[in-house]
Amino acid sequence: AVNNGAYQNDKRIFVNNYTLENKESLVNIDMWPAAKYNLYPIEEEIGKKSYTVTIGSIIRAGIGVAKGDFTLALFPGTKDKNCDIAAIKIIVEEAGGIVTDLYGNEQRYDQPIKGAIICNKNVYNKALTIVKERIKEND
């Protein structure tokens, strides 16, 4: 970790400190029918207490986490977006957040990935538990 911080237009940015227990918490969950990982059951659970959206861009959602606009972003992709998640990992972690695969592991970004959890440190353990309990792999 470099630990020089994340910046937007020369202004330091930080992840927010919200939890998943209130509607102030904005969560992006990318979903599409052919994705390797089915996140619909996860959205159903998280949506009980947090406001969930699907904006259709994991890059924009990841930057939203880094800036504090989003509390959590979940990504079900495996191929072709590994370089996008690699960039988001650097930015979000420099802003004080966490990025792992959907199972809570570090991953390499020069090969297919196992999705991504992108969030602040306050929600990581709760998000990981919800994901692990409900994740389903599509064939």
Map each language-model feature to its residues:
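DPxDG-like acidic metal-binding loop motif
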Residues: 1-7
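Residue-level detection of beta-strand-connecting loop/turn positions
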Residues: 9-11
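An extended, acidic
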Residues: 15-139
